[in-house]
């Protein structure tokens, strides 16, 4: 489902559309079936439909050919238990098959036609004999959509061809279209909400885009400072199946001296038939309190997956149900899930304030006494049944305590997050909350909640899409975003490559690509607000991806260590998100608004005010184009060499390095090597000053784990560089907090055009004793 809609302009204004229902913006029309937009012709030239050819993967099954007057195979049949897709030939075995839809389309008008492709498995689209959608893939149970546009002429018939490899017995396919809009409408923005009492929106104006986002947070709530350990590395997978797997993984990180703060236990840590019991399976996870204590003894933190879902046989379901706080449609329709034989259950109504209190109480009674540190709120759309048509989705998650589900369709994640945030702060007011949720809504930041981008695929195009996705999420006003590094859903070829390597020790072509994909994704992930790896098999621990000494291993470890060196910088940015309404992951347009060349750049970004990151997202690429915004010069992070701004260059991108540049005037504090975020006090800081322009930065520090910063218990140290004089002023400390360092040393390293200096914690600089 769509999240709330917020539009931000580089003209320094934003619009917040205040609606909880399903919304659209831009062109508010819904996509239509192909036959409603075009005349269709099959491959024989007969009007009224395309030709669908279903070529089985089994020799004893005949090829099926039929006319298709629409391509709308996007949903499970409501009456079938995960076994039939609406409109597809039920008798055809899709596993291993090839499907081709072909013919011609004829528009009644000329202009830009927009299409939305719905796909699972492998898919390509050709229009007018040109490949308009290169191969895309998504695992069959988790379809995706992709939008594209093509110019067509009125009355001109053009060939259309879709090649589809379903990749499983149940799979999905769809292609719908929008007719052109008039030229004068192209640049107009429209908003549409399915159900609301009135048209309601906020117009927010500011001096710059940061000021606009500050206005949004004035309306919807401050962004809390996450626990400091949340800024460290997160190791996850689907899934650690035993207590031993969890503890041995964390132990391996420590023995290899690879920094880590957080490890994650995913779904199904309970007994198979006990979803929602909040009890660990005693056979696989004996003594869960002892397990958590062992994690803490290794200076780690634990996040656990908690769904708003309950099997009907659990006591927790019954407790909700007897109070009328459980959605009933799935129970009435006997909807069973995908686990084992399939179990009956549903989700609780998070729109009821008392139901939210009960949801937390059940967690408090079972999980919280174990010492669990963070909460992973999965499926918070809520996703009661996969691949379900929109109307039935609304039926399944309503009615709510506040009214029809259609009216409150998109706010469930916000309500669910409120349950945990208010619940934990009610029990331990000073312990920082951390939540991770799959969906979001306006105001989520006030509940110390981060959002990740869901079950994305292990594809290069999916990795590229994450760059712009993260940036768009950031300018929506919610600063903490993350993704499944490496992608969640894995192509079978990568699984086969891993298994062949396990058996023979040979790195085949697919496994070689798998390693490079993960390398590039980790490089990118190290510069996101949260640094988190997760996904299905193959396992995502660095030593399971590649052995020590391999370029993949070396690179992942390098950037993990660099992340911890950057902790003084990153945590200062976190402080700014609260006190200054700052945004950590920044599209270039936020900092270089006067440079029109940055307006449409979605594959580079600023990490804070200093670092420009240019991820590599093409297999085998050892260089990429980078645009260097005007108004300042740039320094190569690794060599210190200077580059003039206002130009596009092809830069080196060797396997082990991501292109990374620092702008003139930047002041960046780096801390010592660490194995976890609070291993050492930052008593020695290497302070890099990139000369050429005046610059400033403020170091922010607090206790890192509590809410004393809300009471004024924190400290800041300002740095100001005057380029004309070549002087750096380290200002007086402001503020105080328990445990604060009273004395420290700064090693000030200047980088200039004439004296390039690579990043090196041992670089010779000017030592400043500070007290």
Q: At which residue positions do the language-model features occur?
A:
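Extracellular Ig-like/FN3 beta-sandwich strand-entry sites
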Residues: 110, 155-157, 743
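Beta-strand-rich extracellular modules
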Residues: 118-120, 163-165, 733
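Beta-strand-rich binding/interaction modules
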Residues: 124-128, 622-639, 739-754
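Short, well-ordered beta-strand segments enriched in hydrophobic/aromatic residues
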Residues: 101, 611-615, 726-734
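Accessory, solvent-exposed terminal regions and/or long lumenal/extracellular loops of proteins
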Residues: 660-767
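Aromatic-lined ligand-binding clefts that engage carbohydrates, nucleic acids, or primary amines
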Residues: 105-125, 160
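Catalytic-domain carbohydrate-binding cleft regions of carbohydrate-active enzymes
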Residues: 1-49, 56-68, 72-98, 122, ...
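Short, well-structured beta-strand segments within conserved domains
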Residues: 55, 113-117, 156-163, 726-728
């Amino acid at each position: 489902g769509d999240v709330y809609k917020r539009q931000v302009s580089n003209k320094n204004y934003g619009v917040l559309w205040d609606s909880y229902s399903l919304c659209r913006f831009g062109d508010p029309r819904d996509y239509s079936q192909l036959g409603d937009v075009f005349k269709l012709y099959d491959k024989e030239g007969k009007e009224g439909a395309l030709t669908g050819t279903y070529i089985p993967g089994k020799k004893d099954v005949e090829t099926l050919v039929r006319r298709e007057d629409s391509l709308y195979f996007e949903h499970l049949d409501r009456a079938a238990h995960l076994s039939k897709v609406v409109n597809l030939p039920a008798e055809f075995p899709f596993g291993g098959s090839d499907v081709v839809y072909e013919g011609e389309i004829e528009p009644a008008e000329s202009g830009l036609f927009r299409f939305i492709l719905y796909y699972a498995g492998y898919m390509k689209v050709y229009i007018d004999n040109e490949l308009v959608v290169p191969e895309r893939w998504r695992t069959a149970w988790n379809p995706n959509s992709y939008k594209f546009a093509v110019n067509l002429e009125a009355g001109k018939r053009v060939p259309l061809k879709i090649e589809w490899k379903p990749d499983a017995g149940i799979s999905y396919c769809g292609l719908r279209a929008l007719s052109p809009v008039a030229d004068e409408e192209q640049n107009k923005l429209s908003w549409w909400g399915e159900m609301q009492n009135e048209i309601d929106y906020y117009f927010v104006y500011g001096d710059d885009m940061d000021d606009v986002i500050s206005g949004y947070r004035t309306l919807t709530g401050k962004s809390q400072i996450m626990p400091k350990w949340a800024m460290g590395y997160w190791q996850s997978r689907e899934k650690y199946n035993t207590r031993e797997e969890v503890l041995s993984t964390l132990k391996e990180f420590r023995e290899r001296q690879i920094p880590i703060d957080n490890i994650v236990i995913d779904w199904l840590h309970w007994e198979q038939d006990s979803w929602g019991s909040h009890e660990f399976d005693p056979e696989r996870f004996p003594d869960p309190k002892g397990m958590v204590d062992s994690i803490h003894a290794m200076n780690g933190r634990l996040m656990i997956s908690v769904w708003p879902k309950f099997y009907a046989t659990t006591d927790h379901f019954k407790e909700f149900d007897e109070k009328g706080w459980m959605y009933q449609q799935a129970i009435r329709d006997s909807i069973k899930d995908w686990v084992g034989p399939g179990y009956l259950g549903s989700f609780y109504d998070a729109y009821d304030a008392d139901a939210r209190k009960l949801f937390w109480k059940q967690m408090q009674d079972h999980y919280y006494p174990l010492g669990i540190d963070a909460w992973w709120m999965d499926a918070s759309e809520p996703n009661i049944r996969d691949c379900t048509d929109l109307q039935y989705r609304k039926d399944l998650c309503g009615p709510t305590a506040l009214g029809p589900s259609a009216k409150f369709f998109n706010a469930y994640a916000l309500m669910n997050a409120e349950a945990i945030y208010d619940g934990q702060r009610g029990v331990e007011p000073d312990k920082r909350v951390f939540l991770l949720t799959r969906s979001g809504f306006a105001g989520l930041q006030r509940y110390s909640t981060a959002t990740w981008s869901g079950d994305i695929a292990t594809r290069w195009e999916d990795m590229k899409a994450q760059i712009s996705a993260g940036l768009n999420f950031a300018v929506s006003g919610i600063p903490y975003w993350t993704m499944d590094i490496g992608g969640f859903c894995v192509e079978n070829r990568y699984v086969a490559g891993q298994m062949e390597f396990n058996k023979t020790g040979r790195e085949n072509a697919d496994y070689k690509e798998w390693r490079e994909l993960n390398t590039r994704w980790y490089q990118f992930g190290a510069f996101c607000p949260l640094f988190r790896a997760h996904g299905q098999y193959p396992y995502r621990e660095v030593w399971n991806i590649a052995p020590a000494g391999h370029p993949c291993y070396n690179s992942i470890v390098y950037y993990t260590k660099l992340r911890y060196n950057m902790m003084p910088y990153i945590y200062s940015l976190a402080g700014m998100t609260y006190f200054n309404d700052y945004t950590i992951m920044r599209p270039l347009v936020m900092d270089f608004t006067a440079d029109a060349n940055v307006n449409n750049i979605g594959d580079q970004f600023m990490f804070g005010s200093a670092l420009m990151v240019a991820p590599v997202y093409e297999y085998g690429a050892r260089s990429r184009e980078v645009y260097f915004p005007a108004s300042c010069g740039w320094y190569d992070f690794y060599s210190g060499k200077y580059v003039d701004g206002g130009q596009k260059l092809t830069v080196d991108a060797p396997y082990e390095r991501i292109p990374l540049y620092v702008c003139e005037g930047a002041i960046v504090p780096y801390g010592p090597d660490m194995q976890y975020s609070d291993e050492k006090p930052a008593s020695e800081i290497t302070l890099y000053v990139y000369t050429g322009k005046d610059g400033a930065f403020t170091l922010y520090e607090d206790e890192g784990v509590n809410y004393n910063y809300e009471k004024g218990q924190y400290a800041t140290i300002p740095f100001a560089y005057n380029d004309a004089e070549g002087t750096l002023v380290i200002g007086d400390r402001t503020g105080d907090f328990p445990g604060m360092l009273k004395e420290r040393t700064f090693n000030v390293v200047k980088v200039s055009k004439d004296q390039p200096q690579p990043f090196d914690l041992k670089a010779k600089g000017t030592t400043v004793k500070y007290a």
